Amino acid sequence: MASGTAVVTGGNSGLGLETVRAMAARGAVSDLVVACRDVSRGQAAVDSVATGATRLHVAELDLASLDSVRAFPAVIDALGVPPIVAVVCNAGVQVIGGTRLSQDGIEETFAVNVLGHFALVKLLLHHLAAQARVIFISSGTHDPALKTGMPNPRYAGAADLAKGLGPDDLDGGALGRFRYTTSKLCDVYLAYEFAKRYPMSGESGPTLVVSAMDPGLMAGSGLARDYGVLSRFVWRRVLPRLSRFIKGASTTEASGADVARLATDPAFAEESGLYYIGTTPSPSSVLSYDQFNAVDLWNTCATLAGIDP
């Protein structure tokens, strides 16, 4: 077994938990840190994982709180784990029932899906091994060309997204879904920008292998927790039975295995700044290559988090 630590945000349920299971089964890291808001629920989830020789740790991390994110490097220090070789930025929310703000006054979808992960990776840089892998879990919904049925993302500036502002023609649930798809576009921007700023062959400073990944439509996962009763029933009970007939559909188990491969398999250590559908390198959306937007997002996140760009 290779020595090294992997950190999985939201590793206590859904795709995150299946990623933890798959990583433990692969035995490619010596230590796995399940980073989640509720430590007791995280421990209960971890207790269900067959670990083999991999040591599992549960650590508190609330991505909706910048104070919690800032405290996380000290949590890693206290665990005494080896250097981090992989960070899976998986935790995410889709808020449909109106606008919710984080502890820092940031719209919650942006706070958790984008800003929190930006700050986490930046603050962990000096805990990372050379050429550590960083994976941002994105979504095919970021690409209008795929016609997923979700509102198309639009980028008018990260400052507006942080305030919860959106297109005038959207409200209610549609606005919440727009915030989600746009947050997934932002995750691709972050992946490309981290890859550019911390190249894997850099001569000084941290060196990273960064990617964004579309895990596919995983019906039955916890992503629909904010939907109404009927929609949750369809998502959890009906759609999983129809997944094999839906283009781009997957399961949390299959996608978790894909994430584990991207994070630990030597075959995916050769190139940084890629977008994957599953484990297949693929083009991301046309809008995701907009450098002006990527830099605006980076600088805005740095300002909001109080971190040097």
Regions found by a protein language model. Give the residues of each.
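Rossmann-fold NAD(P)H-dependent dehydrogenase/reductase core
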Residues: 1-222, 307-308
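Alpha-helical packing segments of well-folded alpha/beta enzyme cores
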Residues: 45, 186, 190, 255-259, ...
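C-terminal amphipathic/interface module of NAD(P)-dependent oxidoreductases
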Residues: 286-309
